[in-house]
Structure formats: structure tokens, C-alpha cells
Curated annotation (Swiss-Prot):
<comment type="subunit">
    <text>Interacts with HCFC1.</text>
</comment>
<protein>
    <recommendedName>
        <fullName>Host cell factor C1 regulator 1</fullName>
    </recommendedName>
</protein>
<dbReference type="InterPro" id="IPR029195">
    <property type="entry name" value="HCFC1R1"/>
</dbReference>
<dbReference type="GO" id="GO:0005654">
    <property type="term" value="C:nucleoplasm"/>
</dbReference>
<keyword id="KW-0539">Nucleus</keyword>
<comment type="function">
    <text>Regulates HCFC1 activity by modulating its subcellular localization. Overexpression of HCFC1R1 leads to accumulation of HCFC1 in the cytoplasm. HCFC1R1-mediated export may provide the pool of cytoplasmic HCFC1 required for import of virion-derived VP16 into the nucleus.</text>
</comment>
<dbReference type="GO" id="GO:0005737">
    <property type="term" value="C:cytoplasm"/>
</dbReference>
<feature type="short sequence motif" description="Nuclear export signal">
    <location>
        <begin position="110"/>
        <end position="119"/>
    </location>
</feature>
<dbReference type="Pfam" id="PF15226">
    <property type="entry name" value="HPIP"/>
</dbReference>
<feature type="region of interest" description="Interaction with HCFC1">
    <location>
        <begin position="76"/>
        <end position="79"/>
    </location>
</feature>
<keyword id="KW-0963">Cytoplasm</keyword>
């Protein structure tokens, strides 16, 4: 904690520092002082008076239900003026079909591919390749 002495205006309008003895300060700021970082009693009393007791907030099921019923995911709030409409990220499917795509994360195949490259073999795919026209349906 850094304590500064108050400034007093002199007759010429310049600022002058008052000595510590004139201010009634009796402790030092060195590390060996037992009062280092201590708060004077007058300040302590003032801090205690300024602190208000915490008010308890009682939450009931009815209050929570009311609160959650007023929440909205839509942009109909007063701070959204005018309402914004968002275009869909993907166009809607015209004729959806059930296709199955078999895919495996290649991260698990990287060590195997490196091992095969060191040996000089060509890696074989873990799944047999299907011709471009073949589609598996469910």
C-alpha cells in the first residue's frame, strides 16, 4: 500500500508537503513496521458504516416460471429495430433421399500410412472403393 501525504497550499499558491509529525502520522512504511498496511480506526468505522447489509433474494417456482416465460429466442425485442430476417444457410432439399456415406477420420490412418511409406508398400484403402454410380440405400 502506498500512502501519500496531503498537499497544502502555501501563500504563493504553490503546493507544500506537510511533515509527518504535523499530520499525526506516527508509523513508518518500512517492512519491519508492525502497522504496515494497517487501516486507521476512523477509516475502519467509516467503511463499516458504508457497507449495507446484503438483501436476500427469494426465488420461487412461480417467479422463475414467469421469468423464463418472458425470455425469447426470436429477435422481437425492442432493441432489435427493425426485425432482421436471416436467410437459411442451406437451400431446402427438393427431393431428400436416404444415402449412407461411410467415412472415417483420417487421423487414425496417418501413422499407418507413414509406416507403409517407410516400407515402400502402397497402402490399401480400409474400405473397398465403389464405382461412382453405386449408391447404398437404406
Amino acid at each position: 500500500m502506498i500512502l501519500q501525504q496531503p498537499l497544502q497550499r502555501g501563500p504563493q499558491g504553490g503546493a507544500q508537503r506537510l511533515p509527518r509529525a504535523a499530520l499525526g502520522v506516527t508509523w513508518g512504511l518500512d517492512a519491519s513496521s508492525p502497522l504496515r498496511g494497517a487501516v486507521p480506526m476512523s477509516t475502519k468505522r467509516r467503511l463499516e458504516e458504508e457497507q449495507e447489509p446484503l438483501r436476500k433474494q427469494f426465488l420461487s417456482e412461480e417467479n422463475m416460471a414467469t421469468h423464463f416465460s418472458q425470455l425469447s429466442l426470436h429477435n422481437d425485442h425492442p432493441y432489435c429495430s427493425p426485425p432482421m430476417t436471416f436467410s437459411p444457410a442451406l437451400p431446402p432439399l427438393r427431393s431428400p433421399c436416404s444415402e449412407l456415406l461411410l467415412w472415417r477420420y483420417p487421423g487414425s490412418l496417418i501413422p499407418e500410412a507413414l509406416r507403409l511409406l517407410r516400407l515402400g508398400d502402397t497402402p490399401s484403402p480400409p474400405y473397398p472403393a465403389t464405382p461412382a454410380g453405386d449408391i447404398m440405400e437404406l
